[in-house]
């Protein structure tokens, strides 16, 4: 796999737009990913599963679902949170701040997290049970010490792109399927940015888990629906 230093963009908790994510049972047939589809596996790392530094509830349950999905895709991209020590998104970088409080950085509001996914640590490693034989690219994000990164496509400053959109378009990709952790943060912002970049986008709900911080999960689904993201289950994909 190629390692591409990846930037992404921050999404603070924001108010939800109207609408609800569209379940795929409304569609006529099961989806069959072709050569123009990519599976994006977002941040399935030790830090985000039980026992990690920022565990997402039942985060490890996404691994077998993603492994079942993988053989249906000729193209897979993986993202990996890859923070510097003392990162600006860590509560420990500020006097008197606690995890899950917010602060204001130069690009806007920032949720403060426990120290997590520090470069080179086992905490930042991809989950050992992931089986992604057709993965071609790992995008590392959050390595800029002063900017958080959620989306696989843009950094939090909303100015710096990662190059992923160009990479996918150069390979003829038209449709993106997003899985991983966490639904209401990195998954949601990756999906919305995929639509922004001109791709059709599906979030595979049972291949994701959420943090759900102060209603962030419901807000994220509404925001995604408003941007054109479709909400599906792994069973909606042919061959899974």
Predicted regions and their residues:
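Acidic/histidine-rich helix-loop elements
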Residues: 49-57
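N-terminal export signals
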Residues: 2, 8-27
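Short, flexible loop segments at boundaries between secondary-structure elements
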Residues: 205-214
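Active-site alpha/beta core segments
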Residues: 64-175
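Structural recognition of alpha->loop->beta junctions
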Residues: 132, 215-240
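C-terminal segment of N-terminal export signals and the immediately downstream linker at the start
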Residues: 24-49
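Short internal beta-strands
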Residues: 77-80, 202-206
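Histidine-anchored nucleotide/phosphate-binding helix
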Residues: 188-196
